[in-house]
């Protein structure tokens, strides 16, 4: 039986209003190159390659053998995990949290952030975020139906002044300000007084704050990233997301947390209660062990990233790109020499580098208009691979003429 009219799938306006996913072309070429047998050095994704602590993996295995742990968990996280998160905040940042009402476990911070946007935002609402920005900070509010206003990124009073001037021109005023320090993709950092000023601004304007603190424990050269929740009045106006992904090399485990304002946590818990039954219990149990028994691990991992940062920065000096040496995160944000771009935008440039240098980079344009001209370099490979990547880029961008051979002296 034939049908003259093809069946049409009509997707929702929620999908249609999403901005283009600019990493798509990069990921497609990376896949095709690898299928063809090309050894691509992937510095484009912040995906840790170092191992999780052995005892954490052992605890996961042990817990997975207990049939009781194969049942549904609870959507807000087991009580032992929430208590451990609260204890870590007390120990590390001097913050007091009620594990029952001010802490919730999420299936990675991206899931938690996305569901929080559904809980707080809807059509007609507006959020403000810096540009460039981690893509989910744009996509999740858009999927919730909210308008996204981007303000050129900064880490000082001038940035907050730009935000306030932007708010003055908006009606109704925005509901949410999204802040992310140490920043992804730029690795920009702040001092503690930034949070005091941001909280004062948001209290004046009745705007909620969401702090993405995913890289809070990945710090270099003695720098210590300040937690939003350590600032006076923080819990009155907002929440903070953290994750096990970067500090303990548990990215694929998908274990994150949201802490802070009890009403915002309750709204997130309500949404999660409809959407999921929480993460696999053995992952939660192993995460408790990671935080309780491995307080030395995040600083050790940070020292490793600091060393890799130095390797990459030396390579960039040779290539001829500029950068601000990062004090935190697992990225270097580098400005491409305009001569190397050859008139291309950063997406086409990164495609060319994958072709000519077998190196995958994250194009700055994928993070926003103010990222154009930059690339994000992830410190996820070992020293040898990082040096090779820098050498490959240098050869592709700065071809050097071979030295002429000396003529041999004539003999009689």
Task: Name the predicted role of every residue range.
Residues 1-11, 15-21, 26, 31-41, ...:
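PLP-dependent class I/II
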Residues 72-107:
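Conserved N-terminal alpha-helix of the aminotransferase class I/II PLP-enzyme fold
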């Amino acid at each position: 039986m034939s049908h003259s009219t093809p069946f049409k799938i009509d997707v929702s306006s929620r999908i249609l209003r999403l901005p283009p996913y600019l990493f798509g072309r990069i990921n497609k070429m990376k896949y095709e190159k690898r299928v063809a047998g090309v050894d691509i050095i992937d510095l484009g994704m912040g995906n840790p390659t170092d191992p999780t602590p052995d005892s954490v993996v052992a605890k996961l295995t042990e817990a997975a053998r207990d049939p009781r742990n194969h049942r549904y968990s609870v959507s807000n996280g087991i009580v032992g995990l929430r208590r451990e998160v609260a204890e870590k905040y007390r120990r590390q940042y001097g913050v007091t949290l009620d594990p029952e009402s001010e802490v919730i476990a999420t299936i990675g911070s991206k899931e938690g952030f996305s569901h929080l946007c559904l809980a707080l935002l809807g059509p007609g609402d507006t959020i403000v975020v810096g540009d460039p920005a981690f893509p989910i900070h744009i996509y999740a509010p858009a999927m919730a139906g909210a308008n996204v206003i981007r303000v050129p990124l900064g880490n000082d009073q001038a940035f907050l002044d730009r935000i306030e001037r932007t708010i003055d021109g908006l009606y109704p005023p925005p509901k949410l300000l999204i802040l992310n320090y140490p920043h992804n993709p730029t690795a920009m950092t702040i001092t503690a007084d930034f949070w005091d000023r941001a909280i004062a601004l948001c209290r004046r304007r009745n705007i909620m704050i969401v702090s993405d603190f995913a890289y809070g424990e990945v710090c270099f050269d003695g720098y210590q990233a300040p937690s939003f929740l350590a600032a006076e009045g923080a819990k009155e106006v907002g929440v903070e997301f953290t994750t096990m992904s970067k500090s303990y090399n548990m990215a694929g485990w998908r274990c994150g947390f949201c802490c802070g304002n009890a009403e915002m946590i309750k709204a997130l818990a309500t949404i999660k209660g409809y959407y999921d039954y929480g993460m696999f219990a053995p992952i939660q149990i192993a995460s408790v062990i990671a935080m309780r028994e491995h307080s030395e691990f995040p600083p050790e991992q940070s020292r490793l990233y600091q060393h890799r940062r130095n390797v990459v920065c030396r390579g960039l000096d040779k290539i001829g790109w500029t950068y601000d040496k990062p004090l935190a995160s697992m990225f270097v944000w580098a400005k491409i020499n305009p001569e190397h771009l050859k008139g291309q935008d950063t997406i086409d440039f990164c495609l060319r580098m994958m072709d000519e240098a077998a190196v995958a980079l994250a194009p700055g344009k994928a993070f926003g208009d103010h990222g154009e001209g930059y690339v994000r370099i992830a410190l996820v490979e070992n020293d040898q691979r990082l040096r090779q990547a820098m050498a490959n880029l240098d050869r592709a961008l700065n071809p050097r003429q071979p030295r002429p051979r000396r003529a041999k002296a004539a003999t009689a």
